[in-house]
Amino acid sequence: MSNDSSVVRDPLYGWVMVISVFTLTALSFGTMGSISVFLKPLSNEFGWTRGNTAFGYTVASLGSAFFGIIWGYMADKYGTRFFGFFATFFMVSCLFFLGKQNSILHFYALYFCFGAFGNAVVGSPLYANVGFWFKKNPGLALGITAAGGAAGQGIIPLISTNLIRVYGWQDAYMYLSFLYLLIMVPFSFLIKESPWRKKARIAVNDEFRDFPLSEREVITWISCAVIFCCICMSVPIVHLIPLLTDASFSEDFAASVFLVLMIFGIIGRIISGKLGDMIGALPTYILMSIGQTISVLGFPYIDFKVGLFVLAAAFGFTYSGVMSAILVCARMMVSAKLAGRAMALGSFFGWVGMGLGGYFGGLLFDIKGDYTWSFQFASAMGSVNIFILWQFHKRIKKQAHATA
């Protein structure tokens, strides 16, 4: 890895990229999160089970996972200049036609396309681009950028809730498509490739990395951990609003709790990114994972409003901190030339985990009749993630000592 500390000033355009990717991922992640508010209206209208409806999130996640690898490779080889426009076309089209569908197969197909050709395109490839605009404080830059996902997951479900109430779920999807078109096109024009990434792409020799483990081993460890931490976090993302409305809380209150979760998620992503610059990416990842694993367990057991807001804030801060820490790990442990593929592979396992968590959360609800098992399952998967991260930490220390 290059000596980042020797460079004092980063290109100012890097902050334009931060704002642009923040916005695009806010819309993309917002749609993924808004499945939770469409879940009950769709289940009620078509008679689909919670598990079957939540599977829409799963197929979107799997689309993001598998195609994310392709887009990561394309980003490393050709750059990301036109990724915003490509994602705009598919995200807008999928939202528009979701308002027209009346079959669960069409529902799955449209969410798969949204994940594969929208969410996957503006996710890890653009994060890799942003990370290598910055040599001085890449963690902070990535934390702010990643905060867009949390912002979108709080704002878009709230907008969707109000649109559904006023216009119904069909028109809600179509109005969202118009809104996305107006916002995404201008920001897509601002996407440019990192100069560092451009140089790395044409360089004959590999750049120096000051890290004890090979890039392949780093990616393997991160990928193994990510799948379990994302299973943990996806259960509340998909099922928190149905959990609260099943407990006789209003839809407005449920959406407000989710909004608080995501507001603190914005804070968590930024602080986690900066913390990664200060104490290291992996210690930050472990710390945030512990908080996520503990806090997710409480949702089925707290039935008073203040407690739910406090718990949502704690979970939002730590789960979002995990997301930033993953990105900073990839940025600091792999080279610029491989960054797109590294983040895409991590994202692959992350989205597989998100999809599995969303599905099994619904399946366990269908079996048990409430969400107790679902959230216990989420916490158990978080514990597996912490174990893997601790072994990764020990492996780094051992190899660093051996090569000292």
Question: Which positions does each model-derived feature cover?
Answer:
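Helix-loop-helix hairpin linking two adjacent transmembrane segments in secondary transporters
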Residues: T145-K192
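Cytoplasmic helix-loop-helix junction between adjacent transmembrane helices
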Residues: F112-A147
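A late C-terminal transmembrane helix in Major Facilitator Superfamily
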Residues: M333-D370, A378
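Hydrophobic core of transmembrane alpha-helices in multi-pass small-molecule transporters
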Residues: A26, C94, L105-V121, I227, ...
